[in-house]
């Protein structure tokens, strides 16, 4: 997978792209991630990328010219499956979308900044708008990292245990179950006996039931009409 990130603060990504899962994916050759400084496509002596909004109002708006120049340059070199814009008013980013994106080849992720980006960018260049929650951040850089982490961990070979990602929360429409490790008893708190039994079918059944109980307690809307009956 190849991912192009467009940002006004490219240095933000220096450490995350070298450490953790993103660094592993790159070192294994399973992902290419390139960061592009939007100011390199800015206007004039000071490489301006933003301006005041028409009609007045607080904040600044990213101009269309730098974004068009950057994305069109990338698209002239190769084709991209999606041009993703990280924005609070986008579609909710969830595990289903992460699964779908993990099957793509080339992605462009545009990180918003300032008050907004010019609407003509969204109407013409952007193919997917994603939000990581009902909260406003200072820019799209942190959400972009969240998307990349969620997507790349699903690519075969990135995680040491390939099955681990397939049993995470949301993969089967439920939250994940409770997990335990050694010691079997800690400060009077014991691991459920079934997990020590060695009976794989019973263990799997316990995990499914526990996952459903946790989902009903913490995120009942995920169970839909079934939770309403209960």
Curated annotation (Swiss-Prot):
Instruction: Tell me which Pfam families the record gives.
Output: tRNA_m1G_MT (PF01746)
Q: Name one GO cellular component term.
A: cytosol
Report if keyword tRNA processing is assigned: yes
UniProt catalytic activity: guanosine(37) in tRNA + S-adenosyl-L-methionine = N(1)-methylguanosine(37) in tRNA + S-adenosyl-L-homocysteine + H(+)
Enzyme Commission number(s)? 2.1.1.228
This one is known as: tRNA (guanine-N(1)-)-methyltransferase
Which cysteine pairs are joined by S-S bonds? none
Q: What is the lineage of its organism?
A: Bacteria, Pseudomonadati, Chlorobiota, Chlorobiia, Chlorobiales
Q: Where in the cell is it found?
A: Cytoplasm
> Does the record's keyword annotation contain Calcium?
no
Sorted UniProt keywords: Cytoplasm, Methyltransferase, S-adenosyl-L-methionine, Transferase, tRNA processing
Provide the binding site for S-adenosyl-L-methionine: 112
Tell me its family.
Belongs to the RNA methyltransferase TrmD family.
Q: Name the InterPro entries on file.
A: Alpha/beta_knot_MTases, tRNA_m1G_MeTrfase_C_sf, tRNA_m1G_MeTrfase_TrmD, tRNA_m1G_MTases_N, tRNA_MeTrfase_TRMD/TRM10
- Subunit record text: Homodimer.
Please list the GO biological process terms of this entry.
tRNA N1-guanine methylation
What is this protein for, i.e. what is its function? Specifically methylates guanosine-37 in various tRNAs.
The molecular function terms of the Gene Ontology recorded here are: tRNA (guanine(37)-N1)-methyltransferase activity
């Amino acid at each position: 997978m190849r991912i192009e990130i467009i940002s006004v603060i490219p240095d933000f990504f220096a450490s995350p792209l070298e450490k953790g899962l993103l660094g592993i994916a790159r070192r294994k050759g399973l992902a290419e991630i390139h960061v592009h400084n939007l100011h390199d496509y800015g206007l004039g002596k000071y490489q301006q990328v933003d301006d005041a909004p028409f009609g007045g109002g607080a904040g600044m708006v990213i101009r269309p010219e730098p974004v068009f120049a950057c994305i069109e340059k990338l698209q002239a070199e190769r084709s991209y499956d999606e041009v993703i814009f990280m924005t609070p008013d986008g579609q909710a980013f969830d595990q289903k979308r992460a699964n779908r994106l993990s099957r793509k080849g080339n992605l462009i992720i545009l990180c918003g900044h300032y008050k907004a980006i010019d609407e003509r960018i969204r109407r013409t260049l952007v193919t997917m708008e994603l939000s990581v929650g009902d909260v406003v951040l200072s820019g799209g850089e942190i959400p972009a990292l969240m998307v990349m982490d969620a997507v790349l961990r699903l690519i075969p070979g990135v995680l040491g245990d390939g099955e681990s990602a397939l049993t995470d929360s949301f993969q089967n429409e439920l939250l994940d179950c409770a997990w335990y490790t050694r010691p079997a008893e800690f400060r009077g708190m014991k691991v459920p006996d079934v997990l020590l039994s060695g009976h794989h079918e019973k263990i799997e059944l316990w995990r499914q039931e526990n996952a459903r109980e946790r989902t009903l307690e913490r995120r009942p809307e995920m169970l839909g009409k079934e939770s309403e009956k209960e």
